[in-house]
Each structure stands twice: as C-alpha cells, then as structure tokens.
C-alpha cells in the first residue's frame, strides 16, 4: 500500500492520512543499513556509491541482497515478501541518505536496485502467488522496444475551479484524480495534465523468453514482458541472456481494452425513442468483460548478465584489455590461464577438452576451435568493415557426428543459437518487423543471427534451406549486418556472428567421383563465404569402426570415466576471453609467406587431378589471414608468425582439395545384371527350363571357370575424365566442322584407337584398349548421360536397316553438358 490522501465528502479541507507503519519501519531500518553497513576494510560500503548519484545521469543505487541479510535478517525478509509495498519507502530512504551528505535538486528521484538474490526462478514458475514479491528471473531477450518517457506522478489542473492537484500517482496507465480536492467543486472528469510540473522517468519494454536449457522437453518457450526504468533502460540488447531482479505486477491489458469487439460490445446499447435502452439487462454474459482484462508483467529494478564474469555477453567482448580481464579473475584462475598459455601441446589439448565424446575428426575440431578464437575485425580508411569471424561448414554422410559438433558449440558458448535450416525462414534467421499490441508501432524482433550477435549461430540441415532464405543471409555472412526495409522501418542491424553449418550430400552419401560443388545443394556465393569446408565420409575401416564402437560403449556404460578432459570448460572459457583481447599484426615475413601460399592455391586451381572443390578467390586469401590471426590469438602472440600461416594453409588446403576419388567401375552394368540373374529364378531359385546336360556327368564343361568370380574392369578416375573429355571435344569439333555431326559408335571407337596407336604394342593390348573404350562410351551414355544415342525406332520407313542402327547407333553430346574446367 502506498501513502495516499483522500478527501471525504463534506469534510472541508481536512484530509485523512493513511500511514503504513510496516513500510515506514522498513524505511528507517534501510536508512540505518546505508549509514552503518561496512565492508571488510571498515568503511561505509555504500557511501561513495551514493555520493556518485548527484551526477545528472545517475539515479540508481545497486545494493547486494547478501549485505542486507547480514545486516538485518528481518528487514531482508520483509523486503522480499512485501517488495512492491515498501519499495517507494526504500527510495525515500535513499534520497534522505544522499540529501544529508550532498546538495541535490528537489525534483530528482532516486531508485534502489537489488542484486545477488539467492534463488533464481524460471519464467514458467511465475504465477499470481508471486505478485508483489522480490524475485529474480532469467531469460533471453528476444525483442526490445524504444525508450519512452513514462508519467509516474502527475500534476493536474481542475478546469472548473482552477485548483492544482499535485502528486497523483499513475497506476501503470493514465490515471486522473477521482474528484477535485476543492470541497466546493464536484468535478470528476474535467482535468488538464500540467506536464511542466509532472514527473517522468525513462521507460522501456523488453520481451524475454525461456532459454533452451530451461525448457522442458516438448514444450513451447514461454515469453514475458519486462518493464525497465531509469538506469536499467538500454542495459539489455536482443540476444542477451540476463537475470532480472524485481517483482511481478498486474497491469491492465490495453490491447484487449481497445479491440474492436470490446468497443462494439459497449456501443451496442443505444437509447431508444423514449430515452430507454433498446436492450435490457443481459445477465452475466458480458459483465466485467472490459474490467477483467489484465496480464502479468515483470517490473525489473536491476539487470545483470546471467554469467557476468566469464559468460553472458562479455565472452566475445572486443573492448576488454588484459588488465581488466586479470582484475576479474582470482589469483588461482589467473595462474591457470598463464599455465595454459605456456602449454607446448595447447592446440591438441584444447581440441580434446572441448570435444571429449567425439572420436577422431581432428581437423574438424581444430577448425571449430579456431572459429571460437576468431580473427581480428578491421575497418579501412574509407570505412569499409572487414570481418574477423570465421564461418565453417561441415559436409558429410549421415552418422558422422555433424550435429554433435553443433550441439557441443551451442552448450559451450554462452551466446550461441541453434537452429535448423529446414524449419527456418528468412525472417526467423535475420529479423522480423512486428506490430506492438499497445502502441501499434512497428518494432524489430530479433532472429537467430541477431540473437547470436558476438557469438556463434549453429545452423543444422543448411542444405535444406530454400534458396530465398539462403540469399537472406548473404549480407550477414560477409558484411555482418542485416538491412531491413519493411513497413516503414529502415534499419541496419549488427549480426557479428560466426556461422557453423552442417549439410548432407545430395544423394545421402558423398560421391567421391564428383567435386564438392556437385555434392551439396549450395550456391556458389554461399560457398565462397565459408572459410572452411570439412568433408566427413563414412568409411568401412575395421580399426576405425572398432575404436568408435569402443568409445560409444564406454560412454553408455561409464559416462564419467570415459570423458577425459585436460582442461575444464570454465578454464577454456577464461582462456578464450583472455586470448581474444590480443590483436596480432602480420609481420613482413608472414605477409610474404601468405602471398606465396595463395599463389600456390591459385596455380593448383583447375590443374588436373588436384583440381579444387570450387574456385579460389580473394575470399580464400582473407580466410587464410583470419585463420592465421586465430592461431596467433590461441598462442597469445601479438604478431602472426609463419608457423601460424602454415597451419592455416594446411587447414584451408584440407577443405579446398577434392576428396580422394576412387577408381571407376566399368563393369557396373554387368554386376547389376548378375544381381538380377541371381534372384528367385537364378542360383537360389529354380529355372523354368532345365539346362541341357552336357559334358562330364551332365555338368557344363566351363562350370569350374564360371564359378571363379571375374575381376571387374576398373579405370582410374583421372584417366576416365581424360578419355571422356577427349570424346566430348572430338564430337563437338565434328559438330562445328561438318553438317553431319553425329558419329557411329564403331567410328568413335576406331578414331580413339587410332589416336592411341603409338601406345599399343600387341594384339592383346589392342583388344583390351578396345574393351575399355567401349565400356567408357557405355557408361557415358547410360550412367553419366554425357552422350545421347540416336536411333530410328518408331519412325516411318525405319524398318529397313533399323537393326544396324540399334547395334551401332549414332552418338552426340548432350547439349546440357558443360565441360568442367
């Protein structure tokens, strides 16, 4: 209950003053706490902090609830249970405390904020039983509204008798006096607000949502509106995971009060001709519809990051210095960080500690680790920003631990967002413009990339995204901004995030005979924006399979014993925070080495078997620079050294060079035919007609020869590509030179044998080469669809000579086939 004054009808100028003795006692005890509580050095703890409040921009004193409990247990209990009731009195005690020591403006208000509450509640635990209690909740900010002035205490002028009515408290909506305080005047409605003499405070609404860790399985995240006032405004941005300390309150639901349906309900009772209402009393059906529209809102007095020291928004803070980070740590923690920086095997130990449950895939672990350290963002003299964040894409067969990497990073990084490409749209990934229910203004609601600002955005099933949605993140991946022009809102928002994506190959399994670009459903612009591509192939290897199976069984049977970490996750977070404040410069020696390695990549691009997965561009040069800077940061170096560039080049080389391609099986069609023949009517079944009994004892003479499996004819992939390119080039040359462009299959075989005449030394070799070229042509026609057979089947007058056409058809190149560079 707040201090209130009310005028009794006919009581003249006498006012009945209602006193809240409990609140006044709390005010006195809280003033004693501010004046008497001392820190370990014997100084009054809050004296200096209170004296700073005389500055114009300051008005809030943050008090530790632990100190309050130590000073007076009964006072802390009363404040916790009756917070909304006693809060104005606590603010008055603070104003008295400051006023006794410094001169302050009379109109200035002061506010108290509490932190370090012992218990933290989830959003779904907030019920009506917690209204008015001091509570601490946590959640992730998903929407922020602009800051507005809020009327907290109004001064009104009576338009009938000109009486000035001061200090009319506003109850979360515009509240006029019930009646004029002049006993002669009976005005109840005609009042004018005097804005010059009223008191306003900064006011901001934010919407928070349950974090993924708090969410029960299968539940939809709940959200809650939080009201911030005074110094608390602009202290939380979209994507922050914060603790809010305050109380749960009930406010009128303005959006429900102003809905068209409610308005129509009240306007339907119109007066008739005789002044009577056309409708009678309709019972309880509409009783109180407009009066019972209330909702729960959290009024916060203090906002703090969920893990303020080595979590929350400070993990990726670029403005930290080594000294400020050292001051946040204990002596023991700082010694551990220093010990880690001197570790000779730091690179390997960090990888094994970060992903202890994933066997193998060491290159992927190294790439993801360097992504967490990141490069150095730069701004050119013209104002162009060069990103420092590293983007990584993992492509691989099913069950190769792609999603596990994403989940590990999401759990480790305090500002990481996990999403699925198939279930996400462009607005959900970038940002959406939505209309506010109360003010009807358009506000921006953060998407996954904005929520992961200064963090990591993990996108699973990246290849399943629609092309329109992939285009939406082009700008975010390179410029690290999101531009929005919708519904009159034009804004450029920050999305300084690293993207860790996982994608599946097109056919479900990675085809080694094709390049990376042909294996995944991603456009060239998206692929060029990734710094690293890692390809995981599920191979049948007895040693590897045994090691993986042993690791999985160990995890299921002895979870604690099987996880072997050199460093704990908290130690890695502390080391990451310390290492990221380094901004290494590239030395002249490293600069020359980077240029040399880039030239090697460019020369290798498109040269024979080592042809790269996609075009090497300047973006790959920038990727090498970022990876080199991340290596230097990891070793806490102020300068990029050639050994850092060498490791960056090695990692980049892993993703750029084509995965080792197997030999091409030219007897694939015969193997397939054999499988068909071995069906129910083949070896295991019974043939329709018995085989003729010939040879010894009724068995075939060639049975012993046929029983031995014949080795399939295989050709090296590079040789297969060379022969196919020769055939395509020859046929296209014939198309350009002659009118009759098509060649018969036999003519094409004879042409090829003449071309390689110098390589043939014997009749047996000639037969072998002829067999190979015939198999290659068959595969190009029926499997790769590079060549097309022209027949006369079905044409009029085509009966004559049709058999020869079937046996020896004309061949032309598929017009849709593009010869690879």
From Swiss-Prot:
Main EC class the enzyme belongs to: hydrolase
InterPro entries linked to this entry: MCM, MCM6, Mcm6_C, MCM_CS, MCM_dom, MCM_lid, MCM_N, MCM_OB
Main location: nucleus
A GO molecular-function annotation: ATP hydrolysis activity
Domain of life of the organism encoding this protein: Eukaryota
Modified residues (N6-acetyllysine): 643
Residue ranges of domain MCM in the record: 346-553
Post-translational modification summary for this protein: O-glycosylated (O-GlcNAcylated), in a cell cycle-dependent manner.
Subcellular location: Nucleus; Chromosome
List of residues that carry N-acetylmethionine: 1
Modified residues (Phosphoserine): 13, 219, 271, 689, 762
Protein EC: 3.6.4.12
Positions of short motif Arginine finger: 528-531
Catalysed conversion reaction: ATP + H2O = ADP + phosphate + H(+)
BP terms from Gene Ontology: DNA replication; DNA replication initiation; double-strand break repair via break-induced replication; mitotic DNA replication
Pfam families from the UniProt entry: MCM (PF00493), MCM6_C (PF18263), MCM_lid (PF17855), MCM_N (PF14551), MCM_OB (PF17207)
Phosphothreonine: residues carrying this PTM: 278, 791
Note: Early fractionation of eukaryotic MCM proteins yielded a variety of dimeric, trimeric and tetrameric complexes with unclear biological significance. Specifically a MCM467 subcomplex is shown to have in vitro helicase activity which is inhibited by the MCM2 subunit. The MCM2-7 hexamer is the proposed physiological active complex.
Oligomeric and partner information: Component of the MCM2-7 complex. The complex forms a toroidal hexameric ring with the proposed subunit order MCM2-MCM6-MCM4-MCM7-MCM3-MCM5. Component of the CMG helicase complex, a hexameric ring of related MCM2-7 subunits stabilized by CDC45 and the tetrameric GINS complex. May interact with MCM10. Interacts with TIPIN. Interacts with CDT1. Interacts with MCMBP. Interacts with DDI2.
Family affiliation: Belongs to the MCM family.
PANTHER family in the cross-refs: DNA REPLICATION LICENSING FACTOR MCM FAMILY MEMBER (PTHR11630), DNA REPLICATION LICENSING FACTOR MCM6 (PTHR11630:SF73)
Designated name of the protein: DNA replication licensing factor MCM6
Organism of provenance: Bos taurus (Bovine)
Protein encoded by which gene: MCM6
């Amino acid at each position: 209950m707040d201090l209130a004054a009310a005028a009794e009808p006919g009581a003249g100028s006498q006012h009945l003053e209602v006193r809240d003795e409990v609140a006044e006692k709390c005010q006195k005890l809280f003033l004693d706490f501010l004046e008497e509580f001392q820190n370990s050095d014997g100084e009054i703890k809050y004296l200096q902090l209170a004296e700073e409040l005389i500055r114009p921009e300051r008005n809030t004193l943050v008090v530790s609830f632990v100190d309050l409990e130590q000073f007076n247990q009964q006072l802390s209990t009363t404040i916790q249970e009756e917070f909304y009731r006693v809060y104005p009195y606590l603010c008055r005690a603070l104003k008295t405390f400051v006023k006794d020591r410094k001169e302050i403006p009379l109109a200035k208000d002061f506010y108290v904020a509490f932190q370090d509450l012992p218990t933290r509640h989830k959003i779904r635990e907030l019920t009506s039983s917690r209204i008015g209690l001091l509570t601490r909740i946590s959640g992730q900010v998903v929407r922020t509204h602009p800051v507005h002035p809020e009327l907290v205490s109004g001064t009104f002028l009576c338009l009938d008798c000109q009486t000035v009515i001061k200090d009319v408290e506003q109850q979360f909506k515009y509240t006029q006096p019930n009646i004029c305080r002049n006993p002669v005047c009976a005005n109840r409605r005609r009042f004018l607000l005097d804005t010059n003499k009223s008191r306003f405070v900064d006011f901001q609404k934010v919407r928070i949502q349950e974090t993924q860790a708090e969410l029960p399985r299968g539940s939809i995240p709940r959200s809650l509106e939080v009201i911030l006032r005074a110094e608390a405004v602009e202290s939380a941005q979209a994507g922050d995971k914060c603790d809010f300390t305050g109380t749960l309150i009930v406010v009128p639901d303005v959006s429900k009060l102003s809905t068209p349906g409610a308005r129509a309900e009240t306007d339907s009772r119109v007066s008739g001709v005789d002044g009577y209402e056309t409708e009678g009393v309709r019972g309880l059906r509409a009783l109180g519809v407009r009066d019972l529209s209330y909702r729960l809102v959290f009024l916060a007095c203090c906002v703090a990051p969920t893990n303020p020291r080595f979590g929350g928004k400070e993990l990726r803070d670029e403005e930290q210095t080594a000294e400020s980070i050292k001051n946040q740590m204990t002596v023991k923690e700082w010694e551990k960080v220093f010990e880690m920086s001197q570790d000779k095997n730091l690179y390997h130990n960090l990888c094994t500690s970060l992903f202890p449950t994933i066997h193998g895939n060491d290159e992927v672990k190294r790439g993801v680790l360097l992504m967490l350290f990141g490069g150095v963002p730069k701004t050119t003299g013209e104002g162009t920003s060069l990103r420092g964040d590293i983007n990584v894409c993992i492509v691989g067969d099913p069950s190769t631990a792609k999603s596990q990497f994403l989940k590990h990073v999401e759990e480790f990084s305090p500002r990481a967002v996990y999403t699925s490409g198939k279930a996400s749209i462009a607005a959900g990934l970038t940002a959406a413009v939505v209309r506010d229910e109360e003010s009807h203004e358009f506000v921006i609601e953060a998407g996954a990339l904005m929520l992961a600002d200064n963090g990591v955005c993990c996108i699973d099933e990246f290849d399943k995204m629609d092309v329109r949605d992939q285009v939406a993140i082009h700008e975010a991946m390179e410029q690290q901004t999101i531009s929005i022009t919708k519904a009159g809102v034009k804004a450029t928002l920050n999305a300084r995030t690293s993207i860790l994506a996982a994608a599946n190959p097109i056919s479900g399994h990675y085809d080694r005979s094709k390049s990376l670009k042909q294996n995944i459903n991603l456009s060239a612009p998206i692929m060029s924006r990734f710094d690293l591509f890692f390809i995981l192939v599920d191979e049948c290897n007895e040693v590897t399979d045994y090691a993986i199976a042993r690791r999985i069984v160990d995890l299921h049977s002895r979870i604690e014993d099987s996880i072997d970490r050199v460093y704990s996750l908290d130690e890695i977070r502390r080391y990451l925070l310390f290492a990221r404040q380094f901004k290494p410069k590239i030395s002249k020696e490293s600069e020359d080495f980077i240029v040399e390695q880039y030239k090697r990549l460019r020369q290798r691009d498109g040269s024979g078997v080592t042809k790269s997965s996609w075009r090497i561009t300047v973006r790959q040069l920038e990727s090498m620079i970022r990876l080199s800077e991340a290596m230097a940061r990891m070793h806490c170096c102020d300068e990029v050294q050639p050994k850092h560039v060498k490791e960056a080049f090695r990692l980049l080389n892993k993703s750029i060079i084509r995965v080792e391609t197997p030999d091409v099986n030219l007897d694939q069609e015969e193997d397939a035919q054999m499988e068909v023949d071995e069906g129910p009517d083949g070896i295991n079944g019974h043939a329709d007609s018995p085989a003729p009994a010939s040879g010894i004892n009724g068995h075939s003479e060639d049975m012993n020869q046929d029983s031995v499996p014949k080795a399939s004819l295989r050709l090296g992939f590079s040789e297969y590509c060379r022969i196919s390119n020769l055939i395509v080039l020859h046929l296209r040359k014939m198309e350009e030179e002659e009118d009759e462009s098509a060649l018969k299959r036999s003519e094409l075989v004879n042409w090829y044998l003449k071309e390689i005449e110098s390589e043939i030394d014997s009749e047996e070799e000639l037969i072998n080469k002829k067999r190979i070229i015939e198999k290659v042509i068959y595969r190009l026609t029926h499997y790769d669809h590079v060549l097309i057979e022209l027949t006369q089947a079905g044409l009029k007058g085509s009966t004559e000579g049709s058999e020869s056409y079937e046996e020896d058809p004309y061949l032309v190149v598929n017009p849709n086939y593009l010869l690879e560079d």
